[in-house]
Amino acid sequence: MPTDPNSNPVSKAGLTPSSINSNISEVQPTTGLNTINAAAGVKVKETENLRANFTAKSSLPAGSEITCTPQSSPLLSSTPPTVSKSLIKAYPYLIALNKILGVLTWTDDTSYISVLLVTTATLFILYFENFVIYLGHLSIVGLIFLYSIFRSYVEKEQKKSPTLDDVVHCLTTVSVRADMLLFPVSSLNLTSADLRRLLFTSIFLSPGYILVCYLLFPPKTLLLILVIFFLTYHSSWSRVTRKLLWRSSIVRAFCFYNTGLIFESGNNEKSSLFKTAMNKTNKKLKEVTRKAGGKHSGPVRFTYVLYENQRRWLGVGWTPNLLSYERTPWTDEFLNEAESPDNFELPQLNDDSGMYWRWIDKTWRLDLTNDGALQLPSSKYKTTADPKPDEGFIYYDNTWKNPSTEDSFSKYTRRRRWIRTAELVSPGDDSSTDSASLPHSASETVGLTLPKSTSISDVQSVNASGNITTSAETAPDSAGTAKKRKSLRFDATSTVYEEGVSDLKNVKETLEGGATDKKEE
């Protein structure tokens, strides 16, 4: 006898008594397969095994409801009870915070609340005095009323018994919206130098700000502009407007000169031209070391160069606080921004060769000759690790022109040169750091023909194309001219110092000729 489809709804999901939503009617025992129509329209074939899991008749009275216990999250078993209890109590507050962040970031289900907030803030600022005069005594009562509404809302949400999954989902949403709200500031990645530059620029432009407040924008109007800009920053039409305005070079220049900050993504990610040049240099030197290390692996050395830049301010003296549009306090030879000696780190090679950089000099040393611009007695050291405050500087005018070795009232800028030698070595290279010359096998492999007196420790700088410049500047000759600096290029073609080789050959021939004459005599 078939069962009544309206009296035997069976859930498809489970076969336990707790998963049944209604009573099961009495079924005649049969050996065949009978069909049971569930309440959801799902047909389940009844077998003896299926009927054996249930009693012939439910013990619950007719019309009673069975409460289904929700399935617990796997996080519940691994989360301490105290943490779970704290999260459940904080859940209503998280919902309120999520709602506020959604309104401020314009990511709520509807944007009408955000528009209403902007309108209310505008009216409050414009008619603040009237509001205080007529409704000031009611503001405290209004705040208490809002708190009571929020308290009832919290109690109502706590009675709903949220699951741990709901709390985790709400926490994730709050975290994402908080990051979105703070992204305009966090994306700048401001360093201490950037903050100092911003503070200095703001103080420098204070007279202009005061004039603007007195003549153009009263404090109430300026506050209204700032509040509207903040409340509508994340709206879609505001983002489109900023993108269109940012295409103008005038707007970008205005932002730069008023803040001293560079808002380009390249600067935010710290991918300056200096680091780009260093990456190219490391790649070149890595190839050279790999080729030179076939039979006799030796370290490749060169000297890092940093320039310290300062400006004179009337009443203050020489300070590293420069103008926002000029060079930074520390630069490389190409005026690219660089880290200070205290924060300078050797680059890391992200490859499988295992080679790494290490310092040869214990500390940064000041080049007292400033790359040969200053003449020193032969008895005096050319570098020092503990210089005096005004030692080793070259002085310039206000536009970094007309260099001079002497300070004067017409000089407002100056800079000096710091150097430190490093070497690129392989993990198994335990050779002494005193051997500074490049192995002969390396010269043959790379295609470099060097004089015997030339060593890698004389290398002074590396530019973005991988050119290494040496400091092999000889003393001035009788005519008062010095030989030009020579450069080593790590290219496919070999570089030959024809002048040096010819001089060595001439000296060698002269010595051999003199020895032959003495033997004949």
From Swiss-Prot:
Chain ranges passing through the membrane: 111-128, 133-150, 198-217
Primary residence: endoplasmic reticulum
Protein topology in the membrane: Multi-pass membrane protein
Comp. bias (Polar residues): 429-446
Knocked-out gene: effects: Results in aberrant peroxisome formation. Reduces the number of lipid droplets and leads to fragmented and clustered mitochondria. Also results in retarded growth and reduced mitochondrial activities.
Sites where a glycan is attached: 23, 53, 189, 279, 463, 467
GO cellular component, as recorded: endoplasmic reticulum membrane; peroxisomal membrane
GO biological process: peroxisome organization
Cellular location(s): Endoplasmic reticulum membrane
Keyword Hydrolase tagged: no
Coiled coil: none
Keywords: Endoplasmic reticulum, Glycoprotein, Membrane, Transmembrane, Transmembrane helix
Residue numbers spanned by region Disordered: 1-26, 425-446, 465-486
Matches recorded under InterPro entries: Peroxin/Ferlin, Peroxisomal_PEX28-32, TECPR1-like_DysF
Function in brief: With PEX29, contributes to the formation of endoplasmic reticulum-mitochondria junctions which are important for mitochondrial function. Involved in lipid dropplets formation.
Family named by the database record: Belongs to the PEX28-32 family. PEX32 subfamily.
Protein name (database record): Peroxisomal membrane protein PEX23
